[in-house]
């Protein structure tokens, strides 16, 4: 697939001299969580503050009452901009900091490039422009920096209950959460959400903070800014299940801005209604971040209760669909799939789905490590298992370099193919670095390891899965943890 027409790669040149921490998002975008609260961005949830924006009274800024200008120039957002311009990593940006320092392509670097591709030069928030037009206290004006990027989670409606997820992002998690930990409440943005039994004897929130998509204050502000949008990022839950987002996209078509808009999703692509295909063909480009974490049973275990055959079927539908699509594999790497990671990469390299990573510089996948919950973070793994991983990674990299393998699966004289192979090897190198990036105190490490076994065993009991059979190499290294102290949950 050709690159987007009329791209503005020269925008990247305006980032010369930018500190590592610089990201254009605090200047150009508004982000909304699944509970309707405003946040710094989708990656800020890994921080202690969770990146939640607050008003002058210390309350969470919410779509039902907050105005966009107040959010953009809130104390947190002004501080984030000021810290970035000083060359510091702001507190909400800890996830990008960790990933960048491990050699990964962190979200802030990705945003510098993708926004340069899809934003008119006069609207692009380059480092030079940000430095010139941001006030000393970190505040900005809508005239200088219009909101061109809108990031929204329309609630937590989902059809899966992924291992690394929680009730905040999937309504399928309520009962399992209670059965695993014994809690009848959970927390989101500092608010305690009580769970009660409904008429079907299933747990649900006593006050459903995730049902807000028809709020008139939100739509008033969206429609006031809709003509300046150039990119919309839609997440869930599972966004393709949420009717409100299709109504929103239809409005974009009706007012005549769809052909200027790039849609970006994170979706498990297990459930794509015909309405989606009918709408997508009207937009400039649809970037689909495909949330899969392995092949076959590994993905079925992690993204329960998905079926691998259905995902492969929908990959094929994307290759034939009317419209412009760019699919990225946006995996979350954790203890359950780190062993299969090189095999997963090889699957993507050799299956050659035409719309998966179609651009010359597009990597074969854009994985990110699980930071939280810590009991799934690869940093807690035994050192002996990490050494086995390093050896396994080395063997795969050697295989990908071999002439015989290159002849069978690719064109060694093709620069694009060589670039993808090099990127595949870098993925393994970066995760090798990352799994040594966090040093835990002894008692903390014992807690996370003990929690890990409790968690995975309870999930098997509830769901009828078998993590030990699906991930035998991992189990062999973790079974010594059964001797650790219990009751640390």
Sequence positions of predicted segments:
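Core AdoMet radical
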Residues: 147-157, 168-214, 226-243, 255-275, ...
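Short, acidic, metal-binding catalytic loop of nucleotide-sugar glycosyltransferases
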Residues: 253-256, 321
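N-terminal [4Fe-4S]-dependent radical SAM core
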Residues: 2-20, 26-29, 64-151, 169-172, ...
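Extracellular structured ligand-interaction cores
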Residues: 26-29, 35-38, 47, 90-93, ...
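Alpha-helical packing segments of well-folded alpha/beta enzyme cores
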Residues: 150, 218-221, 248, 311-314, ...
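Radical SAM enzyme [4Fe-4S]-AdoMet core and its adjacent flexible, acidic
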Residues: 1-66, 70-71, 109-115, 174, ...
């Amino acid at each position: 697939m050709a690159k987007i027409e009329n791209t503005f790669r020269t925008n990247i040149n305006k980032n010369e001299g930018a500190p590592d921490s610089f990201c254009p998002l605090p200047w150009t975008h508004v982000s909304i969580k699944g509970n309707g609260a405003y946040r710094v961005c989708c990656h800020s949830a890994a921080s202690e503050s969770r990146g939640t924006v607050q008003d002058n009274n210390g309350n969470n800024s919410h779509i039902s009452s907050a105005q966009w200008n107040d959010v953009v120039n809130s104390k947190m957002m002004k501080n984030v901009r000021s810290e970035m311009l000083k060359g510091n990593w702001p507190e909400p940006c800890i996830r990008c900091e960790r990933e960048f320092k491990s050699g990964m392509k962190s979200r802030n670097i990705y945003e510098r490039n993708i926004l340069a591709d899809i934003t008119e030069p006069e609207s692009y928030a380059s480092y030079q422009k940000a430095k010139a037009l941001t006030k000393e206290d970190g505040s900005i004006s809508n005239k200088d920096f219009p909101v061109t990027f809108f990031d929204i989670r329309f609630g937590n409606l989902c059809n899966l209950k992924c291992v690394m997820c929680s009730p905040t992002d999937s309504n399928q998690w309520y009962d399992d959460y209670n059965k695993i930990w014994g809690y009848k409440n959970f927390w989101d943005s500092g608010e305690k959400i009580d769970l009660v039994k409904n008429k079907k004897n299933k747990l649900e929130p006593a006050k459903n903070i995730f049902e807000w998509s028809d709020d008139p204050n939100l739509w008033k502000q969206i429609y006031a800014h809709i003509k300046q949008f150039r990119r919309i990022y839609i997440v869930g839950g599972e966004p393709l299940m949420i009717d409100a987002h299709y109504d929103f996209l239809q409005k974009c078509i009706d007012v005549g801005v769809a052909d200027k808009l790039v849609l970006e999703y994170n979706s498990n692509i297990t459930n794509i209604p015909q309405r989606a295909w009918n709408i997508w063909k009207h937009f400039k480009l649809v970037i689909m971040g495909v949330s899969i974490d392995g092949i076959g049973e590994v993905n079925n275990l992690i993204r329960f209760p998905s079926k691998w055959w259905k995902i492969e079927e929908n990959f094929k539908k994307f290759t034939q669909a009317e419209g412009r699509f760019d699919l990225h594999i946006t995996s979350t790497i954790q203890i359950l799939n780190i062993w299969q990671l090189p095999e997963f990469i090889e699957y993507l390299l050799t299956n050659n789905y035409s719309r998966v990573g179609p651009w010359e510089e597009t990597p074969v996948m854009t994985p990110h490590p699980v930071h939280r919950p810590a009991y799934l973070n690869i940093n807690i793994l035994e050192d002996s298992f990490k050494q086995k991983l390093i050896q396994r990674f080395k063997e795969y990299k050697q295989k990908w370099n071999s002439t015989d393998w290159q002849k069978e699966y690719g064109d060694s004289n093709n620069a694009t193919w060589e670039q993808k192979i090099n990127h595949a090897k870098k993925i393994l190198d970066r995760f090798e670095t990352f799994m040594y990036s966090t040093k835990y105190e002894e008692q903390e490490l014992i807690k996370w390891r003990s929690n890990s076994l409790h968690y995975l065993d309870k999930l098997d009991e509830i769901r009828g899965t078998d993590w030990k059979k699906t991930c035998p190499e991992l189990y062999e290294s973790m079974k010594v943890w059964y001797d650790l102290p219990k009751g640390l949950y």
